[in-house]
Amino acid sequence: MIGLLVFKEKLKQFYGKYNIYIVPVVKFLVGLLTFWLINANVGFMSKLKNPLIPVVMGLVASFIPYGVTAFLAGVFILIHVAQVSLEIALVIFVFVLAVTVLYYGFRPGDGYLLLLTPLLFFLRIPYVVPLVVGLSGSLVSIVPVCSGVCIYYILM
């Protein structure tokens, strides 16, 4: 048990020392994986299927908050779906608008949950985020997790 406490303190010191580098790298990886998975699973527009687009969007995501990244991912999905069917794009637009209103109305600090939930669903570990949020998050944190689950099933 003492070993875990020592490891925790060393991890806190490392994060405190290199916070300025760790946060943008994690945001880049989350953004890259998000846009790459959208391209791989939705990918109807050939101009956006370029492998460089997710890398550029990941770089952009490393400098903006998670909420804006989630909104850009929604717009990215809308552009792909509008290539096939404007009616379905309109339905998804209404859903993205409702998620945005709920998200910013309740708790804008939990944007990473909105991105991580569908991301981990695609990586075949679906119940990690809902379980962790249920055990350690607040009651309002359920909104981005539920929205992330709905987004996953829309993409599938």
Residue spans for each PLM region:
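Hydrophobic transmembrane alpha-helices
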Residues: 20-74, 81
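Alpha-helical transmembrane segments of polytopic integral membrane proteins
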Residues: 31, 35, 113-116, 125, ...
